[in-house]
Swiss-Prot record:
This is Putative F-box/kelch-repeat protein At1g20790. Disulfide bonds: none annotated. Keywords: Kelch repeat, Repeat. InterPro entries: F-box-like_dom_sf, F-box_dom, SCF_F-box_component. It comes from the Eukaryota. The keyword NADP does not apply. Kelch repeats lie at residues 192-238, 280-335. Residues 1-49 form the F-box domain. The keyword Repeat applies.
Amino acid sequence: MKRLPLHLLDEILFNLDPKSLGKMRCTNKSINTHISDDPNFKFEYFSRIGSSLLHISKVGSKFLCFYPYAISRLFKNMTPLKNLCNILGSCSGLVLLSINGILCVANPLTKKFRFLHYSIWGNETWIGFAVDQIDRATQRFKIVFISEQLEVSNPYETTYQFRINTGESWSLSKTTITCRASNLKKGKNSKPVYVNGDLHWLRKDGSIVAFNPETEKARLIQSQFNRKPGKLLLCTGDNRLTLISATDAVISVYALETDGQWILVRWIKNEVVHQSLPLLYWNVQAYDGKCLLVRMMSLVGSVIHRYDLRANKWRVLGSIPTWCDADRDFFLFKPSWSSVIGLLDQEHVHVLMPMPMPMPMPMPMPMHMHMHMHMPMPMAMPMPMPIAMAMPMPMPMPMPMPMTKTETETVTRSEVISSVMAIMGLVNRTLSFIN
């Protein structure tokens, strides 16, 4: 092996799965040193490695499940947390977390993270997570909070506003976009997607709101093409915005071209739907251009099926524990060894971490909105429901509820940091072969 040219050795190692690469470290001292100490090898290997799968309850949970790449087993890799956790996004090796309502950006591979001075209670679907690769070894992140507001003067139009955070503070973008009224899609398959510099939110009518956090330009992307009614998933594949349209018979993959046109790039026969009878529920959960994940729920349990686009084959990826609730968020996770601007080691984060606090003052409302809110309620309108039962009203910026004193007292800095470290440790343990 010592006589083998380094570039040939790298090509061999790059094609190994994580488990096999870990075994290679034990065969030769020089290979072990090369894998563990050469940063260029790490950057290249993690750029080629396949995606792992994270999933957690959509309403938050103290248990996070992780399915590492190329390891054949059930979804047994899980970790208990001290606090309620949500995963709000996963992009380029980073994860955006909400720990008891406190936002945190973390890189599980490098074990660096950062808390943001903002607490989120509800409306997590409206948060977009963007990560840019500045150079081979450096990344930076941005978080965008989108709000929707029905126009009082024209109830057939909706206006969107954007608030941006780069790690230090929140700023209100001067950009707004007004378009035909339709609410942002919530619930299943509603997570925003970041690709080619733009964050994308799917609306109920199938159109997409796009916003560039760097240029602060917004646009509406239409998706009116020949697709049958079915399940929709907004995602990214081969560095293009992708829309999955799935029925019991076929799963169609559409990609957005640079000219704004959608093209059909893949047609997949939905074989697994008919193999999982009696079937209670199914849905397309994730896609990255290389694989497609479909979840099937039957009377005997819940199973994730994986379609390999290169091999054109379906296979069972794993089963989900029976104690997991049906409504779950799934994220494909691809680790990154890059240094991220703003992320810190644990000893520095402990000092900078914000305690849960009341929310900042809401954004100023447009004058016509103030006038509308102070107008007398017409007699024909029903009396408002109690706050606990009322439906959320359109606001210029949906403001999360502040934590109560009791909740603040029960959430300590050490507990929140412990939960973040446990999440990163769950992923990092699987990839410890290279650290």
